[in-house]
Amino acid sequence: MGCIVCSDGIVCRLKFLPFAAGANRLAGGFLKISEVLVKVGDGVHTLLLDRPIVRDGRKFDAPLLWMVVLMTAFGLLMIYSASVYLASKEGGDQFFYLTRQAGFVVAGLIASGFLWFLCRMRTWRRLVPWIFALSGLLLVAVLIAGREINGATRWIPLGPLNFQPTELFKLAVILYLASLFTRREEVLRSMESLGWQSIWRGTANLIMSATNPQARRETLEMYGRFRAIILPIMLVAFGLVLIMVQPDFGSFVVITVITVGMLFLAGLPWKYFFVLVGSVLGGMVLMITAAPYRVQRVVAFLDPWKDPQGAGYQLTHSLMAIGRGEWFGMGLGASLSKRGFLPEAHTDFIFAIIAEEFGFFGMCVLIFCYGWLVVRAFSIGKQSRDLGLTFNAYIASGIGIWIGIQSFFNIGVNIGALPTKGLTLPLMSYGGSSVFFMLISMMLLLRIDYENRRKMRGYRVE
């Protein structure tokens, strides 16, 4: 068994045996549940994601393009509707926020067009290290020369505009992990051979490595075996630390979920996935409890009506806006909440304004649109995987996770299902950096689909 003996002669590892035995039994139950979930998931996977890609003869995914165009246009319309009162009150120009957002949309469309025509996916793959390094440097720069707004330093001032590096980092992480897993996928899959006992043994070694030489040696051996995965993930973790310093807990959660999700798609075994998810959740709980304002948000989320004029003000007014919408809404422009009652109506809480003006029906249509985008992204990713375009597959799936988790969190906050956090609704909320890089990600989906279709027709795309 190879016990580790502490300096005082006590055999430490024996203390972990009862715990490990219980953990093994619990793990067996989890694995049985996971087998059922995999079978169900395979059925849903086949039903939703399998689709012919050349049956219509088109060279690109026209439905995806039109969905992005329509959602972006609707987002501009709702930004104007939600911000007209605020803009008129602040400076008298009721088109102020609409004009700024439209400028970023136009810039995003132009940049997307140029990149679509000029950069094949193999070019993107060569640029990944530079993009990731640039995003990391900008995360450092924002802490040095950033502009503080509402107590957070998240923006770099560029004249009259503000640039948010975190939005670039979200896309950079997807590209970086896609490149990493394409090259090192076998390392993750090799972890399947390690049992639960190895996990607990590795955990014990890590805990005791500071004081026990043998535990330190075994920890270093484990690190050397999986260094090709551990070191890059540590770089992503360092970026997450910089984001928490800003602080931006919402983006931290989104990027963490993207990373965990892509690890799972890359073949991380179920047992490690459960351990990783548990560790992440535990870490998030610690970060929430460490910041009084986050604790206050959680308390307000649990019972917003206890303090409707204080900590629960934003959430209660969001819920009232949604309630006023009823089935079919009050009509475009007829929202009452945007008239100074609901803070951030054109940014984080634009979904509540949409619900107020278009009702439950409008909410369902918008949620369907986001669900359609997520399924489309995973469908394109599956096609790339089937065609042997692994790098493309990871990018498409990562973008699907990004859209899905960020829209889920934003909508969840608006309807009172999640604590308040500062996240935009993709393609809808006011935010230049957000919409710019979301349009770039949509361009990547279209480019990946285009290369899928070319390969299906016999062209070489690598």
Swiss-Prot record:
It is an enzyme of class 2 (transferase). It is a multi-pass membrane protein. GO terms for molecular function: lipid-linked peptidoglycan transporter activity; peptidoglycan glycosyltransferase activity. InterPro entries: Cell_cycle_FtsW-rel_CS, FtsW, FtsW/RodA. GO terms for biological process: cell wall organization; FtsZ-dependent cytokinesis; peptidoglycan biosynthetic process; regulation of cell shape. It is found in: Cell inner membrane. It holds the Pfam family FTSW_RODA_SPOVE. Pathway: Cell wall biogenesis; peptidoglycan biosynthesis. GO terms for cellular component: cell division site; plasma membrane. It comes from the Bacteria. The chain crosses the membrane at residues 64-84, 98-118, 126-146, 161-181, 228-248, 249-269, 272-292, 349-369, 387-409, 425-445. Residues 1-63, 119-125, 182-227, 270-271, 370-386, 446-462 are cytoplasmic. Peptidoglycan polymerase that is essential for cell division. This is Probable peptidoglycan glycosyltransferase FtsW. It comes from Neisseria gonorrhoeae (strain NCCP11945). The lineage of its organism: Bacteria, Pseudomonadati, Pseudomonadota, Betaproteobacteria, Neisseriales.
